[in-house]
């Protein structure tokens, strides 16, 4: 039940987009493409292999945005001695994750970076 130019695997539809966007714009783009669309998430290594089989022939050695990030909420941070983190001196840049199309290693990148991306939705 996927759209004609999408690929199906284990009850989900996938599409690689060869257009560079930042993480938030790519996520919004996926949400507009199809009902319940999002940047790709992975349940197991076979799903990863499937995504690589789609992305590598089209993109070669590139990074693609995946749905993992701390974009929507802050992680819980505390000092090693247990003190609360009340004073913060880091930049406000959020971190998102991109996957290598060669071996799917996940790499933390600034969410403002622009990469290709893969969308996923239920079939």
From Swiss-Prot:
It is found in: Secreted. Disulfide bonds join 2-13, 30-119, 96-111. Keywords: Disulfide bond, Hemostasis impairing toxin, Platelet aggregation inhibiting toxin, Secreted, Toxin. The keyword Disulfide bond applies. Pfam families: Lectin_C. Its main location: secreted. One of its GO terms (molecular function) is toxin activity. GO terms for cellular component: extracellular region. PROSITE patterns: C_TYPE_LECTIN_1, C_TYPE_LECTIN_2. Belongs to the snaclec family. Heterodimer of subunits alpha and beta; disulfide-linked. Forms an active complex with the pentameric immunoglobuline Mkappa (IgMkappa). Echicetin itself inhibits aggregation of washed platelets induced by vWF, thrombin or alboaggregin-A. However, when complexed with the pentameric plasma immunoglobulin Mkappa (IgMkappa), echicetin binds specifically to GPIb and activates platelets. This is caused by P-selectin expression and activation of alpha-IIb/beta-3 as well as tyrosine phosphorylation of several signal transduction molecules, including p53/56(LYN), p64, p72(SYK), p70 to p90, and p120. In vivo, it induces thrombocytopenia when injected into mice, probably accounting of activation of platelets rather than inhibition. This is Snaclec echicetin subunit beta. It comes from Echis carinatus sochureki (Saw-scaled viper). The lineage of its organism: Eukaryota, Metazoa, Chordata, Craniata, Vertebrata.
